[in-house]
Amino acid sequence: MRRRDFLLSAAAGAAGARWLGPGSAGLSLAHDQAACGPGYASPREAMAGPREKLLYVVALYVGTGVDAPDYLATVDVDPDSPTYSQVVHRLKMPTVGDELHHFGWNACSSCHADSSVSRRYLIIPGQRSSRIHIVDTHDPRGPTLAKVIEPDEVHAKANLSAPHTVHCLADGQVMISMLGDARGRAPGGFLLLDDAFDVAGRWERGATGMQFNYDFWYQPRHNVMVSSEWAAPTTYSGGFNPQDVAAGKYGQRIHFWDWRERKIIHTADLGETGQIPLEVRFHHNPDSTHGFVGAALSSTIWHWHRVGNRWHVEKVIEIPPAELEDWPMPVPALITDLLVSMDDRYLYFSDWLHGDVRQYDIRDPSQPRLTGRVWCGGLLNRVHPLRERRLVGGPQMLQLSLDGKRLYVTNSLFSSWDNQFYPEMAESGSYLLRIDCDTDHGGMQVNENFFVDFGREPDGPARAHEMRYPGGDCTSDIFA
């Protein structure tokens, strides 16, 4: 079944329409009335796009003691709506225990030149189960489940497990980073789904030097992809053991790939000050070779760019550890998520253990300048703006509005790690809050009028992780 057949079978009569986000009056003609595909032609055009009115958030019950399936929460983020700052819909997955984690779209701005494509389907994998859910957002306020790819199929056709990052490709396929083989062993690889959401096999042809896998981002104009390393699922799934770091069971490398040849061409070993490199972000400008990666355990930010035919990688930010009386070692900040604003001016990242979110001016990528900082819980117990609420856990996943003015934050990292470092979260649930960003001068402030308490969900307290907008965002759209 090809793309058009899938669209027709999923929603009769809607295959020719294109979903452009909650501000576009539903299923309608494109914003430019031209024969274009989803998303935007450029980052500048994206910044001028409609303001987000809905936010999709994965919520999970793994590790909470609640015997219920994970679900996709639809949150109203339109301040003019009577249901503002509320969960307005919950789509439950069919099976308990998936651990929904990261997710992405079937199409984004990389497919903008293809008028046959629509940004309509969310690909939502289970990190623990390796089950992949295809969710139809034809009704943006009431998504439905369109298809489920069972783990046995993924194991049999690709010998992969533990799906993580989801990116659409310009040819209509979807690529997912996989952290293990069918038995949960490193290094994993990259899974391809075709345009009918069938398993098409593996993407990579040559992965020599890759010991682990995690995140990836590609920049097609420069024929390059960058990937990072966490650990094997058999290592991280039960929680964090510092001895595993000393034993070499966690990554400290990033890999540069030839995008067309699908093989590694350069590996940068970040050493002891680059342990556990997680999220990778290129500039949104497709002509740029600049990008960043956050090394979680070392609490450092690394900048890369191409100099001639070589890739240069340098450490540009380092967050010192903090001393706590009840900890046997200095507490690292633990940088767990980062993103770049659509205009490539600001870098944001979260320090999950310390509890702060930081904003840096990166107009000079080699010399980031701190311009804003807010506290959102964390182990250091610093004062935060929502003083009437005790924020359990630390800031983790981030999502920024296309215009760069609103930063949304959730606090769950991974269920077993949550239970290890923030055991109260299993009973309190997660938060979703909004930080208002000054894009002219720098600076941030928590918005006290927006707060979603996932501790009050109908089936019990839930954990909230990654977020997406129907109209595209700063971590899913890649410009070709």
Please identify what each model-predicted range represents.
Residues 5-27:
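N-terminal export signals
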Residues 75-82, 135-143, 303-314, 360-371, ...:
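Short loop/turn segments immediately following beta-strands, especially the blade-tip
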Residues 34-51, 102-118, 162-170, 217-221, ...:
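Structural signature of eukaryotic scaffold interfaces centered on beta-propeller domains
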Residues 58-66, 116-119, 177-186, 230-249, ...:
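Short, conserved, GDST-rich strand-edge loop motifs in beta-rich repeat architectures
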Residues 58-98, 115, 124-148, 206-213, 217-360:
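Beta-propeller domains
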Residues 138-217:
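Asp-box/WD-like beta-propeller blade repeats and closely related beta-sheet repeat scaffolds
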Residues 88-101, 148-158, 204-209, 266-273, ...:
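Surface-exposed loop and turn segments in beta-propeller and other repeat-based domains
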